[in-house]
């Protein structure tokens, strides 16, 4: 299974990069992981809704260039479906059983994802009604993917 994580911006904080590297290494036993960083846009303080839409559209265009035909696209969205770790594991397992060999997970930038990306997604996933920093979300997402593979393999993993 190939798993792509697509997100705007670079992770700058060393501790987050270290965590991303650790989970990437752990996941290498289970899947082919590809982290795709697209250029992000600077969001001015107190930007109007129109400016926010333009920023999301530009980031969305960059993200869309990496979405592959035949891939199952999961967009992280606050209004998406919340799953337990076991349910996410079952979803990944079910996709594999149905012949899906490529999953792309998309994380939005600091103001979220463009509507075009949300419409293109095959599934909207929410981790919470709360908002998380998009750089931290990469670590959380990687940990949950790793946990899903451990669950599917019947291997122990701390709770």
UniProtKB/Swiss-Prot annotation:
Which top-rank group of organisms is this from? Answer: Bacteria
Query: Where, in this chain's numbering, is S-adenosyl-L-methionine bound?
Result: 76, 108, 127-132
**Which UniProt keywords are listed?**
Cytoplasm, Methyltransferase, rRNA processing, S-adenosyl-L-methionine, Transferase
Listed GO molecular functions? rRNA (pseudouridine-N3-)-methyltransferase activity
Subcellular location per UniProt equals: Cytoplasm
Q: Which GO cellular component terms, listed alphabetically, does the Swiss-Prot or TrEMBL entry include?
A: cytoplasm
From which residue to which does any coiled coil extend?
A: none
Q: Which EC number(s) are documented for this chain?
A: 2.1.1.177
Q: Which Gene3D superfamilies match?
A: 3.40.1280.10
The protein's annotated catalytic reaction(s) are: pseudouridine(1915) in 23S rRNA + S-adenosyl-L-methionine = N(3)-methylpseudouridine(1915) in 23S rRNA + S-adenosyl-L-homocysteine + H(+)
Q: Which residues cross the membrane?
A: none
Q: What class of enzyme is it?
A: transferase
Q: How does it assemble?
A: Homodimer.
Q: What does this protein's UniProt record list under function?
A: Specifically methylates the pseudouridine at position 1915 (m3Psi1915) in 23S rRNA.
Family membership noted in the UniProt record? Belongs to the RNA methyltransferase RlmH family.
- Protein name, UniProt field: Ribosomal RNA large subunit methyltransferase H
From what organism does this protein derive? Answer: Bifidobacterium longum (strain NCC 2705)
